[in-house]
Amino acid sequence: GSSNLVDGNCADMVANYPELANLSNIQCENCHGPASQHPGQAGAEDVKMATSLDASVCGECHHENVQWERSFHSQEDDRAFTYPAGPGRESCVKCHAGGGYIDFANGVPQDEYRVEVQAHTCAVCHDPHDATNPHQLRVYDEVVLPGSDTPVTGLGSSATCMVCHNGRRAPEDGGLPHYTLGGAALLGINGETYGVELGNTAHTALPTRVDCHM
C-alpha cells in the first residue's frame, strides 16, 4: 500500500535483502505466460489461466534444484510414476502422481484425483500461492498414518514426506500392500504388538527427515 512508499525503502531492500530484490516485480505472467493468450479462450466453458507443474517454471528464479534433479522424484519415466497412474488408479495417485498429491492436499474427493503421469516437481509439494505454512508447503506439521489412521503432530516440514513414505497394511480382500518405510519406523508407531517392549529408535530425539535429506 501507499504506507510502504517511504524514501529509502528500495535502497534498504537492495542493500540488506539482495535475494528479495532479485525477486521484485514477479507478476502473474512470469509463471502463467503472456496474458495475450487469454482472449483466445473467450467463450470457453472453463476459462482458466495456463498452469504448469514443470520444474522449469520455478527454475526461472529458484536455482536450488540440483538435489531434486538427482532424486527419483524428478524422474517422470520411472516406474513409480508410470505404473500406478492412469484411469482406475485414484487410490494410488495421492503418492504416485503429482496432480494426485495436490488434489489430496487440497481436500479433493479421492474419486476426483487427477490420474495423469506427473513427477513430483516443485509445485507439487510447495503451493506457489499460499504462504500459510513455512516454505509454502501444502502439508505441514500433521499427518494421518495410513492403515491405522493414526494422527501424528509436531512433524514440521517432515509431514510432507510422511504422507507417502509409510507402509500400507495388507487388506483382507487383496490389493497391493506396501512394506513399511521411514515414517512409522522413525516414530516407533503404527506397527504390530508382540508382547515385548522395544526401545524407540534414537532418531526420534534427533532432527527429523528433512534435516537429513533436504
Model regions and ranges:
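Short sequence/structural segments immediately N-terminal
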Residues: 1-214
